[in-house]
Amino acid sequence: MVTTHNLGFPRIGAKRELKFGLERYWKGESSRDELKALGAELRRRHWHDQRDLDLAPLGDFAFYDQVLDMSFTLGNLPKRVQDFHGDALDNYFRVARGRSAQSAEEHAACCGGVAAGEMTKWFDTNYHYIVPEFHADTNFSLDPSRLLQQLAEANAQGVNAKPVILGPVTYLWLGKAKDVSDRLALLPKLLPVYGALLDTLTAQGVEWVQIDEPILVTELDAEWRQAFRTAYAALETRRIKLLLATYFGQLQDNLTLAASLPVDGLHIDAINARDEVDALVRELPAERVLSVGAINGRNIWKTDLNAALDWLEPLAKQLGDRLWLAPSCSLLHVPVDLASEEKLDAEIRSWLAFALQKLDELKVLATALNEGRDKVADALAANAAAIDSRRRSPRVNNPVVKAAIARIDAQLGNRASPYTQRASKQSARLNLPAFPTTTIGSFPQTAEIRQARSRFRAGALDEAGYRTAMRAEIERSVREQESLELDVLVHGEAERNDMVEYFGEQLDGYAFSQFGWVQSYGSRCVKPPILFGDISRPKAMTVEWIAYAQSLTRKPMKGMLTGPVTILNWSFVRDDQPRAVSCYQLALAIREEVLDLEKAGVRVIQIDEAALREGLPLRRAQWSEYLKWAVESFRITANGVQDDTQIHTHMCYSEFNDIIASIADMDADVITIETSRSDMELLDAFDTFKYPNEIGPGVYDIHSPNIPTQDHIVGLMKKAAERIPAERLWVNPDCGLKTRQWAEVIPALTNMVAAAKTLRNQVQ
């Protein structure tokens, strides 16, 4: 009999209950006990949703991040919070998001509070984790309370639970040494704590533990491979059964290593690594379980169940009880329940599967394998009809768009003149001071903005009333910026709910969900649009709003657009054509908007590519192909403008050392990047690579409520000036200010502008 299980379930709740609960707690509107009760209720509900599984995950729920949870389980707290006492949950949030100075005790780090932990992308997804911090003298100590509490809850609910933990080698690999020490040197101190954790779970009657080691799908050198052998040899003596889980890619040169590790089962992502299944069957010891991730855990399209059974049935005959079935990865990356989508186009809806529907698909596959296809004939027939409907739909294919793609040539992405010539023309037109100040685009999405949008979408506010409300918010943003004496202004994006969804709503080839939320980090959720067909732009999308904002000020007003690569990487993308083709389609559509903004007199146009790095394949050998079409797509979008129009781009959560040449090849006049959490470490790339254009290193962390001091910002910019000529530096926050409050934004920007004025006097 095939065993079904799941690697992880979305933790935010079908209606984002966790998000709202966290925000109430952070604002002091609810108690710690109320937040903990909400977590328990969500876990209870999610285990109920997974009741048909043979094994349900435990420990996949986190109040902020599963990697941060593992750091606390291992007793690895950053030194700056180790002296704080009180409830562990407050320390947890100190690490996750920082804390504004509320007492003399907390006035400890930069910005008048506790510096938040560094945050970066979880592999090639749009989820973010808090980076573990290591020092040569780091020690570990077990705190199993979180897992034991959840295990008690699961037992009380009658759940056959499988605890999920991050493996020791991946944990070290994901972290960062805060000194010159080697992370792997900590492995001997870390392994006994893992062993103690497994012993603790064994004593509680746990049979299986899922231990995630996703770095096995990346390129590992000999030292890291040996770390796997060392780690699992040390854990082999435990009486508990280990399911080693890999996902997000192929094992390739790590396949033999993974198959040889002394564990009881191995999970493989059969969406990305289906071709490796046969090799694993040959290499795995005869008694070992092979868990096959046959349902895509990262996209929302229905699985072709009949096609899946065609290759799973021979495998089931060969492996028998050793075959387990699961999604390819945790379902954290997809929305919770398609049944909530009452307004989604019925035809498109029939092509989709969210987390609960993916578990239904898993059940159909297992039933067919265990009892025969006849037992689920109706479900298989309905699935086949949906797959065929999508394949044949004329809504998916647009001959006009395909013809435009065929006409793309090498000249389409080139500016008329090189940067040095453009810069002099832009300087004459814009007349900016040294260290010009700007923001990244968005200002706080206030309760009034959200209420107006909600009433407009519900039909309680007509279009004229909505436009009046948004214009008032834009005017407020402009007046605040002028009062702050910023140099290049933005309109604040009051009319935009999300930087990708806003554009997707206005492009043909996109569809939108009501409740298709996924977690990005902490309480931050995104609702990716659904790219189901060929992309085109029926009409201008932003010109009216930007032109209105420009009419309110003599200062330059940035046109704000999301770039094609980011729109692609932050969407649920069709899987019936190469991603590069969809990206080129987006590039042509956004290019039309860029040219319309220029015609409207907009002098500065920002094209955000926040997610450029996120699309990089996990293996470097595949980077060049991705970067070629990603950079070309940006250039097609941006480079049709005149020399005196200044093109900005923004990137966040990015490390630049290894892709700096490609970023330079984008040829944006100004690039703004996130650097504050890494204390300008990202600028190390510029020690050896002479970046030719202008750059704005982010000077304060917008993900934290902490207010940066003027001196702190001056210090960061002086570090930047050691690498980048001062005449090519801009001063700006790390990212957009959408998630902050005006009460935080005003003092932070006041200090930022004051710092820029100080720099103009100090740095020649």
UniProtKB/Swiss-Prot annotation:
Q: Give the metabolic or biological pathway.
A: Amino-acid biosynthesis; L-methionine biosynthesis via de novo pathway; L-methionine from L-homocysteine (MetE route): step 1/1
Q: Which GO terms describe its molecular function?
A: 5-methyltetrahydropteroyltriglutamate-homocysteine S-methyltransferase activity; zinc ion binding
The cofactors it requires, by name, are: Zn(2+)
Q: How is the cofactor bound?
A: Binds 1 zinc ion per subunit.
**Residues that coordinate or bind Zn(2+):** 650, 652, 674, 735
Detail which positions bind 5-methyltetrahydropteroyltri-L-glutamate: 16-19, 121, 524-525, 570, 614
Task: Give the annotated active site.
Answer: 703 (proton donor)
Instruction: Please list the reactions this protein catalyses.
Output: 5-methyltetrahydropteroyltri-L-glutamate + L-homocysteine = tetrahydropteroyltri-L-glutamate + L-methionine
Enzyme Commission code: 2.1.1.14
Binding of L-methionine occurs at 440-442, 493, 608
| Record flagged with keyword Transferase | yes
Q: Which Pfam families match?
A: Meth_synt_1, Meth_synt_2
Q: What CDD domains does the annotation carry?
A: CIMS_C_terminal_like, CIMS_N_terminal_like
The answer to whether UniProt assigns keyword Nuclease to this entry is no
Q: Provide the binding site for L-homocysteine.
A: 440-442, 493, 608
Give one GO biological process term: methionine biosynthetic process
* UniProt KW keywords: Amino-acid biosynthesis, Metal-binding, Methionine biosynthesis, Methyltransferase, Repeat, Transferase, Zinc
The record's NCBIfam families line, in alphabetical order, gives:
met_syn_B12ind, PRK05222.1
Q: Which PANTHER family match?
A: 5-METHYLTETRAHYDROPTEROYLTRIGLUTAMATE--HOMOCYSTEINE METHYLTRANSFERASE (PTHR30519)
Q: What does this protein do?
A: Catalyzes the transfer of a methyl group from 5-methyltetrahydrofolate to homocysteine resulting in methionine formation.
Q: What is this protein called?
A: 5-methyltetrahydropteroyltriglutamate--homocysteine methyltransferase
Q: What organism is this sequence from? A: Burkholderia cenocepacia (strain HI2424)
Q: What is the lineage of its organism?
A: Bacteria, Pseudomonadati, Pseudomonadota, Betaproteobacteria, Burkholderiales
Name of the encoding gene: metE
